[in-house]
Amino acid sequence: MAYGTNAPFGLRPLSSISGGSWTEKVNEYFIYADALGTNTYGTSIFTGDPVIFNPVAATTLAGAPTIARYPIDTATVVNEITPVLGVFVGCEYESTVTGTNNLIKSPYWPASAHVVPGSRIKAFVIDDPDVVYDIQVSTATNVLNDAKFSTDAATDAFFTQNFAFGLGAGGGNLVPNNPVTGNTRTGQSAIYLNIVGTAATNRVAATLPLKTIGLTSDPANVFLDAAGAVRPFLNLRVTINNHISRVGNLGITPA
């Protein structure tokens, strides 16, 4: 875990909001593939990515119920209003790439991969709305200070407020820059909590996907540096605020 370093990893399950550890329960869903297996879902989904019900496939009996990666709008975060189904943690499919119809168990779905005709792409999703997750703070801007969860530890922090996801963007003074996609070697997500993109006036919106409830408990996740300044790229504990099984709540109004 790279605390204090710009290394977003999506949503990582930690515990339950009702107390105790995460139970490791997941449910099985599907990723879209046509009958021939040559037209499949065209966006990669990585472990830690938030997912939704596919709004296209859900309208047809043959295609439902399939999932899609959450529609992240880093530039206009108030557009992130779709209820979250859960968090993707891997998939299983029959690949035709080698010509031997191999069963592939993967931490990520490779966009548009071909599968055996008539087979289904299984996706495993943490869909419990009570799960508490670990996520890293970052920013879509080129300003390092914008990657801080607070500008003044004594007077300014954003706990119990609502936030959007971010992916990519950010550069310049961010070292390293935000990755624009998940890691195809490890299968890990590159999604982060978009701190600066979610303006104070929007952090009360019940439709935003994330609610912050505290710092991730780890000795390495240090809020302040040696000079007493707030560090960037902190890890936070969050819940899914706007969930398919639970209506989102308003964030606390900033003082």
Describe the predicted segments one by one.
Residues 1-255:
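Surface-exposed, low-hydrophobicity beta-strand/loop segments enriched in small/polar/acidic residues
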